[in-house]
């Protein structure tokens, strides 16, 4: 069962790979990071809308990267209210845990997409069409980096 949005890394080993997901109805951004280096990178964006196709891609990623845990962004509003997509993100996290048996951590993702937009713009990707293919993967990277930063001093 996914943990609360407090994003505790309790019980994680000192080393290992993490995969993070920026869940959306049309796309899912995916990022990869390492516990030892505490660094995250964008990986890819899943453009499939059908659940079976999405989970087939995710299964291949899990087989390839062999993560010790997963991180799913949980959207919220700036005033603390839950975003309308939050229940779907929780369901996605529960499905990941149920299908694959890997620990799943939920982490606050407020403003991750806006920050990803800024980061891509600052990197010289001008125009929505240039940023769109990588936006969700960069948002997943920011979610995972936030999780790693929150737990930088957590005992392994």
From Swiss-Prot:
Enzyme class: hydrolase
Stretches that traverse the bilayer: none
GO biological process, one term: rRNA 5'-end processing
UniProt xrefs under InterPro entries: RNaseH-like_sf (IPR012337), YqgF (IPR005227), YqgF/RNaseH-like_dom (IPR006641), YqgF/RNaseH-like_dom_sf (IPR037027)
SMART domains in the record: YqgFc (SM00732)
UniProt keyword terms in alphabetical order: Cytoplasm, Hydrolase, Nuclease, Ribosome biogenesis
Cross-referenced Pfam families: RuvX
Localization in the cell: Cytoplasm
Gene Ontology cellular component list: cytosol
Documented EC number(s): 3.1.-.-
Family stated for the protein in its record: Belongs to the YqgF nuclease family.
NCBIfam families: RNAse_H_YqgF
Function text: Could be a nuclease involved in processing of the 5'-end of pre-16S rRNA.
Name of the featured protein: Putative pre-16S rRNA nuclease
Record organism: Azoarcus sp. (strain BH72)
